[in-house]
Structure formats: structure tokens, C-alpha cells
Amino acid sequence: VISPEMVTRSGLRWYKNRVVVNYDMDAKNLLKAQPSDSEDGVNKLLTMSYVTASRLLLANSFGTLDSAHVYKLSRIYPFHQFARSARPLDAFTADYPRVYGMKLTDKWSSLTFFNEDEEHSQKIAVRLSGIEGHGGAGLQADKRYYVYDFWNDRLIGIFKGSDVLEQELRKGEARQMAVREMESNPQVLSTDRHLLQGLLELSEVSWNEETKELAGYAELVAGEPMRIAIASNGWNPQSCSVSDAEVKCSSEKNSEDIVKLSLESARGGKVFWKFSFKK
């Protein structure tokens, strides 16, 4: 199991070195994750191990795990290799941290809400433009941001940088979110491949104004579709294409402004993709 005290002790070490790697040899058992009556127990254990410890010592052999457990476990691998960890954003405004943030680029942050209560739901909030460490996420007040929920695979909404983001979390839930500055052209919001939602599995993603194409590279797992959530931002999605004829490429409109691009390869590996749009 992973207790609230364990998460707190590990997370607060950020303020010693600004980077946290916890070498505690207490292995984590996915089959005993709490709460046990929903997927939130396993999701929480994996999320908070990644966010506050930067490693996971697994107690289970793969022979004891079903395909659903293995799939969830693979959402936190690989661990990122650069020297940066999530910061407890409410470290000095709460009894213990429930909000963690990590700047990935100047326009993109990772945000984690943690409900330590395994019996009751709880509202958790952060001021998006507030001071980091004092209850804020340090974003720009004059910008607008998409917030996308990883485990629940949904767009939470579009927020002003001056807004307070408040969410009601289920009992024992850890909600992992990507916060991306809103652009005028189509943009990637998230993927279903990794907890950091595009940082490790996607590269060189850019918008070509001349060809009206969003393009980039994706690192695919053999036999597993990768779904990329894209905000069309007022543009109409047209067609997708890939550099490898053996890679399947398809798309479907998920909502009025969100389209899902799906890539699948039998052998895996890196593939170049592009997705065309028109006004």
C-alpha cells in the first residue's frame, strides 16, 4: 500500500534538493492497493509513486497480474530521466500536500491532485496563477489553459490563468492532469500512453501554418494503439497519415472540439505522423 504519510514525507523532500528519488525498499503490491473496490486504488499507488518517489519497487511477479494491471503499470514507464520532480504546491497552506505540479515547458505543466481519504470524496483546489508552494500553480494570469484528465481520459475544461481549478475527487483518487496553454491552431492535449501525457512518447510536435498540418513523432508499443487527444481550436479535422505503411492511422471526433488520433503498429517503434485541418 501507499499511505498518506508516505506520500507526504517523500513529496516534501522536494524542498531539500528540488529533485526527489526515494530509495525506500518497501515494495508496492498492486493487488492490495486501496481503495480496493475501484480502479482508483491502483491508479493512486502508481501515480503517487511516480510523482513523489520517482521510482517503483514492485512486490508482484508479472505472473500474478492480469492484463489490466499490466496495462496500468505500463502507464508510468519509462520514468523520465531528466533531473526534475513534482513540487508540492500547497506545502505551506495545508496540513499536508494534496496538490503537486511540475513545469514541463513554458506552456505546459503536469498537475496532480491527491485525495488521501480512502473512505470519502474530497474537493481539492489550486489557484492556477498563484505562487508555487503557497497554493498556486505559477501559471500566467493573462493566458487560457486546457486541463486534461489522464486516468479518466476527459477534458476537464478551459480555464483562465487567473481561475481557481477545483475538482471533487473520489475516495482515494489521484487525478493526473496536463495543463497546456491554449493556442490558435490545433494542438495536442494528452495521450493514453504515459502519465506525463505526451512528454516521453511524443517528440517534435509542431503546427505547419503553410500546409495546415499538425505533425510529430510517436514512440509506439508493439500491438498497442496509442490515442492522442487533440484540440482542434475551431479548425476542421481532415485526414491523418504516417511514414510507415504498416502503421494504422485513424481518427474520430470525441466531442465538439476534441478529436482522437489513433496510431497502431504490430512491431512498435518510432513513427512520423501528421494530421491535416482546414478552416
Residues covered by each model-derived region:
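Extended hydrophobic-aromatic, low-complexity segments
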Residues: 60, 120-124, 156-159, 167-168, ...
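Aromatic- and carboxylate-lined catalytic core of secreted/periplasmic carbohydrate-active enzymes
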Residues: 46-91, 174-190
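Extended Gly/Ser/Thr-rich low-complexity repeat segments
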Residues: 225-239, 267-279
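Carbohydrate-binding surface patches
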Residues: 49-52, 57, 92-139, 178-180, ...
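Solvent-exposed beta-hairpin/edge-strand motifs
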Residues: 130-153, 230-246
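Glycan-recognition surfaces
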Residues: 1-67, 93
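C-terminal beta-strand-rich structural cap/linker in extracellular carbohydrate-active enzymes
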Residues: 158-199, 253-279
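Low-complexity "stalk/linker" and mucin-like segments enriched in Ser/Thr/Pro/Ala/Gly
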Residues: 245-253
